[in-house]
Amino acid sequence: KLSTQKQLVDIHHSGKPYIIYKSKKGFDLYTNFSRKIILNNKNVGSFLNKKYKSKKKETDLFIGFFGYELLNNLINIKIPNQKNINFPKGIFYKPEKKLKINNKLNYKSKDKFKGSKFKININKNSYARIFNQFKKKIKSGETYQIKICTKYKTKSKINPLDFFSRLSETNLAPEAFMIRDKNYSIISCSPENLITKEGSNITTKPIAGTVKKTKGLNKIKALNYFKKNLKETKEHNMIVDMERNDLSRICKVGSVKLHKQKIVEEYKDLFHYVSLIKGKLKKEIKNIDIIKAMMPGGSVIGCPKINTLSLLNNQEKENRNIYTGSFGYIKFNGDMRFNIIIRSILNYKNISEIS
């Protein structure tokens, strides 16, 4: 019997599409896809509303991503004409095989990364102009918090498993994932869980606040830093209030509770300021209602979410593609887990795009 590490290497070298998603004890690998659904603005509703019979298999699920543009369209927020590489708005796969990798990925490629210099999609003057316009919008009360997207691009072919394995060693994140398909790959070291739905229970875990690890800075000192830092505290409070409000739209009255408030989570190179919010879903709520209420994730957009999305979309000249969309799975029994796609690389048509 082959070890899971050997099976991973064999699957990678076979050229077959596969997905790796961080689990509590290691990683889950999904492959042997029997269906691939490319989403667009017309079919996303039917995809989310369709019901499948569960055979109580670990592979009774669809796994994939919703892009930023698709999520905007789902809540009737229009995006003006932007530069677009025509990458799919969302893709979901039905796996027939799942492997559990209970330790590190331990994969190293002999190939060296070859890429040209990175080009940034917005120059300093343009960024400053947008920044100053948004400052005026904050002063006039149109938004309270807003987050601009910047992209770095280079011509390159990448080995996604090699990149993902190395990133997992240097920056292991609880919502990390990678997708390798024939014509594209995605790598993300996302730390943020946007939705975990089990039965009628739903949780969200907003992150707002980051400090780099330095010598002598432990979790207690990091917590004191966040508490004393007015900017970090106010930003966190705003995002938590917004996520509670989003949950309240789909949950039973009085069921939305803050279970963990302003705790510090430790990563290899930094500390995050985190809260955990739980709720009990209303009986009539469907998965499409949850997606519409919670996505795109507010902590990487700003607040109030709807108005802020419109402001961003009118100023940003290039499509975000996967960035600030969501990756995860929908089980046949209706349970879901989705992250927010940040700290990501999209490789498509031999262009690597970091957002």
Predicted segments with their positions:
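Extended alpha-helical targeting/anchoring segments
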Residues: K1-S355
